[in-house]
Swiss-Prot record:
<dbReference type="GO" id="GO:0008234">
    <property type="term" value="F:cysteine-type peptidase activity"/>
</dbReference>
<dbReference type="InterPro" id="IPR025660">
    <property type="entry name" value="Pept_his_AS"/>
</dbReference>
<dbReference type="InterPro" id="IPR013128">
    <property type="entry name" value="Peptidase_C1A"/>
</dbReference>
<feature type="signal peptide">
    <location>
        <begin position="1"/>
        <end position="22"/>
    </location>
</feature>
<feature type="disulfide bond">
    <location>
        <begin position="297"/>
        <end position="352"/>
    </location>
</feature>
<keyword id="KW-0865">Zymogen</keyword>
<dbReference type="InterPro" id="IPR039417">
    <property type="entry name" value="Peptidase_C1A_papain-like"/>
</dbReference>
<comment type="function">
    <text>Probable thiol protease.</text>
</comment>
<feature type="disulfide bond">
    <location>
        <begin position="192"/>
        <end position="241"/>
    </location>
</feature>
<dbReference type="InterPro" id="IPR038765">
    <property type="entry name" value="Papain-like_cys_pep_sf"/>
</dbReference>
<dbReference type="InterPro" id="IPR000668">
    <property type="entry name" value="Peptidase_C1A_C"/>
</dbReference>
<dbReference type="InterPro" id="IPR000169">
    <property type="entry name" value="Pept_cys_AS"/>
</dbReference>
<keyword id="KW-0788">Thiol protease</keyword>
<dbReference type="InterPro" id="IPR025661">
    <property type="entry name" value="Pept_asp_AS"/>
</dbReference>
<feature type="active site">
    <location>
        <position position="161"/>
    </location>
</feature>
<feature type="glycosylation site" description="N-linked (GlcNAc...) asparagine">
    <location>
        <position position="254"/>
    </location>
</feature>
<keyword id="KW-1015">Disulfide bond</keyword>
C-alpha cells in the first residue's frame, strides 16, 4: 500500500512539473466540431488566434467589441483550466469545448440544473430499491447495444438537465417493459412540472432554473404521464403548460432510489434499464473524450442530471496506475460534446458523487 501510494505521488509530481514547465506551449488535443479531425491547441501562445478558431468551430459571434474582449479573457482562463484538468485527469482528454467562453458560474447556471439540496440525496422520498442479486452480472454492459436508448438530445442554454435525465429513465423503462423505444417530452416537464422536495420547499422543479428527477417522477404520477417528444417538442425555454392527457404515451407507476453501492447500481441498471443519476459536472466543462478518472472531484457538489446507460470493465487510469472499470453516461449537450454526446467516468469511491443520487422508474403503456 505504501509503495503504491508513493508511486501515485511521484506520478502526480511528474505531471505537475510537466504542466508548469510547459504551460506556454503545452498541447492538448482538441476534437473539432465534426469529431473527425484533431487539431493541436497551443496553450498560452497565440491566444486570440485560437479564440478565433474556437469561434469558427462552434459558430460563436459577439455583438460588441467589449463582449468579444470579455469572452477572450474568459477563454484564456478556461484554456488554463483545461490544462489543470488534464493534469488531474490524464486518462481523459481535456481541452477547448463549446463551453470555453463561459465562466464557471455561467456554465453551471445554463448547462447543468440539478437543484441544490445541500449534498443530500435530495428530492421526493421514493422507496429504496430492494437489494438485487449481483452475482453473474456481465463484465461489460451497454443499453445502447440493445436498442434501449434514444438519440443524444440537447438541452441548450437551459438548466433542464433534470428533465432529460427523467425522460431518459422513463424511455428506458418503457423499452424494458414493451420492447418499444419512444422519445418522450422534456418540454412537458419544463413547462408544467413545479413539484417540490417535501424536505426542502426551496428545491422545486423550475423549468430552466433547475429541478430534481425524483420530484419529476412525483409530478408524472400525479399528472398521468408523459407525452411523446413529437407531440410536445422541446424549445429550450419555459412556456405555458400545454400538456394534453389525451396524448399521454407512457405512465409512471412508481420510482425507487438505488442504494449507495456500485454493485447494486450496476445490477439495477442491467435488470431494470437506464438509471437517472446526478453528478458533479466540474470536469465535464473541458471534457473531450476518454475515461475520466480525476484524482479529486467533490462528491457533495452534485449539480447535473444525466442518464446511466452502461459500464465497461477496463479503462486505464494513469494516476491510479491500473485499469479501472467505468460508467457509460448519456449527457444532454448534443452530439458534438464529449464522445458523441457521452461521458465515461471511473467507477469506484463515488467519484464526482455519481453514487449519491441514483433512481429507477417503473412505467406502463398509456391505455
Amino acid at each position: 500500500m505504501v509503495a503504491k501510494a508513493l508511486a501515485q505521488l511521484i506520478t502526480c509530481i511528474i505531471l505537475f512539473c510537466h504542466v508548469v514547465a510547459s504551460v506556454e506551449d503545452l498541447t492538448i488535443r482538441q476534437v473539432t466540431a465534426d469529431n473527425r479531425r484533431i487539431r493541436p491547441n497551443l496553450l498560452g501562445t497565440h491566444t486570440e488566434s485560437k479564440f478565433r478558431l474556437f469561434m469558427s468551430d462552434y459558430g460563436k459571434n459577439y455583438s460588441t467589441r467589449e463582449e468579444y474582449i470579455h469572452r477572450l479573457g474568459i477563454f484564456a482562463k478556461n484554456v488554463l483550466k483545461a490544462a489543470e484538468h488534464q493534469m488531474m485527469d490524464p486518462s481523459a482528454v481535456h481541452g477547448v469545448t463549446q463551453f470555453s467562453d463561459l465562466t464557471e458560474e455561467e456554465f453551471k447556471r445554463m448547462y447543468t440544473g440539478v437543484a441544490d439540496v445541500g449534498g443530500s440525496r435530495g428530492g421526493t422520498v421514493g422507496a429504496e430499491a430492494p437489494m438485487v442479486e449481483v452475482d453473474g452480472l456481465p463484465e461489460d454492459f451497454d443499453w445502447r447495444e440493445k436498442g434501449g436508448v434514444t438519440e443524444v438530445k440537447n438541452q441548450g442554454a437551459c438548466g433542464s438537465c433534470w428533465a432529460f435525465s427523467t425522460t431518459g429513465a422513463a424511455e428506458g423503462a418503457h423499452f424494458v417493459s414493451t420492447g418499444k423505444l419512444l422519445s418522450l417530452s422534456e418540454q412537458q416537464l419544463v413547462d408544467c412540472d413545479q413539484a417540490c422536495d417535501p424536505k426542502d420547499k426551496k428545491a422545486c422543479d423550475n423549468g430552466c432554473g433547475g429541478g430534481l428527477m425524483t420530484n419529476a417522477y412525483e409530478y408524472l404520477m400525479e399528472a398521468g404521464g408523459l407525452e411523446e417528444e413529437r407531440s410536445y417538442p422541446y424549445t429550450g425555454k419555459r412556456g405555458h403548460c400545454k400538456f394534453d392527457p389525451e396524448k399521454v404515451a407512457v405512465r409512471v407507476l412508481n420510482f425507487t432510489t438505488i442504494p449507495l453501492d456500485e454493485n447494486q447500481i450496476a445490477a439495477n441498471l442491467v435488470r431494470h434499464g437506464p438509471l437517472a443519476v446526478g453528478l458533479n459536472a466540474v470536469f465535464m466543462q473541458t471534457y473531450i473524450g476518454g475515461v475520466s478518472c480525476p484524482l479529486i472531484c467533490s462528491k457533495r457538489n452534485v449539480n447535473h442530471g444525466v442518464l446511466l446507460v452502461g459500464y465497461g470493465s477496463k479503462g486505464f487510469s494513469i494516476l491510479r496506475l491500473s485499469n479501472k472499470p467505468y460508467w457509460i453516461i448519456k449527457n444532454s449537450w448534443g452530439k458534438k460534446w464529449g464522445e458523441n454526446g457521452y461521458y465515461k467516468l471511473c467507477r469506484g469511491h463515488d467519484i464526482c458523487g455519481i453514487n449519491s443520487m441514483v433512481s429507477a422508474v417503473a412505467t406502463q403503456v398509456s391505455s
